[in-house]
């Protein structure tokens, strides 16, 4: 770690205090499957930067369990039919691919990421068939008789039985990310007649984002990021965004080590942290009442800025548009305001002050403060 005297001082970045999550109206599955996230304000350009990175991490980086193989009594290969079962094995495989299982491989659980075999015995007698109208559906929930996996869609039909029988079914479940075709899946101790499946591990179905303009104080040149995430239920949208953020942080940490110099960001000034009366007393001060160079004072006077209130409500880019107003004057003014615990581009809306009425409001507040002093005197 470098000496703090070599740290670089950067101007503050506007950041959201928190990310707001809300349900999407009309979405199937509710907030457990579809949610909207809003982050604002962000510096111009950061909305697309964060939105694109999060979208990619959500689509390719998240992990979830999936069935990677199965075996069943009487099934020798994928291209056959089983007597007493309506679906052929090819259709059973397709149904298994649509099975959604939920579980997190915990760090303190030995072998938590290893593939697991889930075994089930399906016994169907004549009374079961009669109660079901002659065709008994076997669902994903029926096959999860052991293990700690939870079925997201337990009513999902795997196959349909038409005569009394007893079947032994084995499902092998593994964790992964993205999509893996069957030829890329390597199984340890693969059993005879064990059929390997294509596996869709990614729990994220769809990610959309867009960026809107938003304001900070009187400055509208900021971004609002709106991110909409849809999952299949194996991971909730809120969890998905949190996991994607951690994945990105892990990768960015590699680049963070490239230079010993560290950036220290200036703190944003919050009006809430200061006593309102103290701030008002500063805002009504005339420009000529603070120690500025003649050049800076003249620049502000030429721009018809008479009070500190008129100055601090002004966004930095707008100040630079005034005639003869350069970087040197800007730096001097920012340093002086920092000494006063003020800054450019402040939001004074809680005082009823905006760019359109700041001059009149400062006069009104100045008169109010003078009247208050005279009354106390």
UniProtKB/Swiss-Prot annotation:
Domain notes: The N-terminal domain is essential for RNAP assembly and basal transcription, whereas the C-terminal domain is involved in interaction with transcriptional regulators and with upstream promoter elements.
Source domain of life: Bacteria
Keyword Amino-acid biosynthesis on entry: no
Family: Belongs to the RNA polymerase alpha chain family.
Renumbered residue ranges of the record's region Alpha C-terminal domain (alpha-CTD): 276-377
Gene name of the record: rpoA
Organism: Chlamydia trachomatis serovar D (strain ATCC VR-885 / DSM 19411 / UW-3/Cx)
GO molecular function: DNA binding; DNA-directed RNA polymerase activity; protein dimerization activity
This protein's name: DNA-directed RNA polymerase subunit alpha
Enzyme class: transferase
């Amino acid at each position: 770690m470098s000496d703090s005297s070599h740290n670089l001082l950067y101007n503050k970045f506007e950041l959201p205090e928190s990310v707001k999550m809300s349900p999407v109206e009309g979405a199937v599955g509710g907030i457990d499957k579809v949610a909207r996230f809003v982050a604002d304000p962000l510096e111009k350009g950061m909305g697309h930067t964060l939105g694109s990175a999060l979208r990619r991490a959500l689509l390719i980086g998240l992990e979830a369990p999936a069935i990677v193989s199965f075996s069943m009594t009487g099934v020798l290969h994928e291209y056959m039919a089983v007597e007493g079962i309506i679906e052929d094995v090819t259709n059973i495989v397709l149904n298994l691919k649509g099975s959604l299982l939920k579980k997190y491989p915990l760090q303190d659980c030995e072998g938590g990421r290893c593939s697991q075999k889930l075994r089930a015995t399906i016994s169907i007698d004549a009374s079961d068939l009669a109660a079901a109208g002659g065709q008994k559906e076997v669902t994903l929930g029926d096959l999860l008789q052991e293990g700690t996996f939870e079925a997201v869609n337990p009513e999902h039909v795997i196959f349909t039985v038409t005569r009394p029988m007893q079947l032994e079914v084995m499902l092998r479940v593994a964790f992964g990310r993205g999509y893996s075709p069957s030829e890329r899946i390597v199984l340890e101790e693969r059993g005879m007649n064990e059929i390997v499946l294509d596996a869709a591990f990614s729990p994220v179905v769809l990610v959309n984002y867009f960026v809107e303009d938003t304001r900070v104080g009187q400055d509208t040149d900021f971004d609002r990021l709106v991110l909409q995430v849809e999952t299949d239920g194996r991971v909730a949208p809120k969890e998905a965004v949190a996991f994607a953020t951690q994945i990105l942080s892990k990768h960015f940490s590699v680049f963070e080590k490239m230079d010993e110099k560290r950036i220290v960001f200036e703190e944003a000034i919050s009006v809430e942290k200061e006593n309102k009366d103290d701030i008002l007393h500063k805002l009504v001060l005339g420009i000529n009442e603070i120690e500025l160079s003649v050049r800076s004072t003249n620049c502000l006077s030429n721009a018809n800025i008479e009070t500190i209130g008129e100055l601090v409500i002004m966004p930095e880019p707008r100040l630079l548009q005034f005639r003869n107003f350069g970087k040197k004057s800007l730096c001097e003014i920012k340093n002086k305001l920092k000494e006063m615990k003020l800054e450019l581009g402040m939001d004074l809306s809680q005082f009823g002050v905006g760019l359109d009425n700041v001059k009149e409001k400062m006069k009104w507040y100045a008169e109010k403060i003078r009247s208050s002093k005279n009354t106390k005197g």
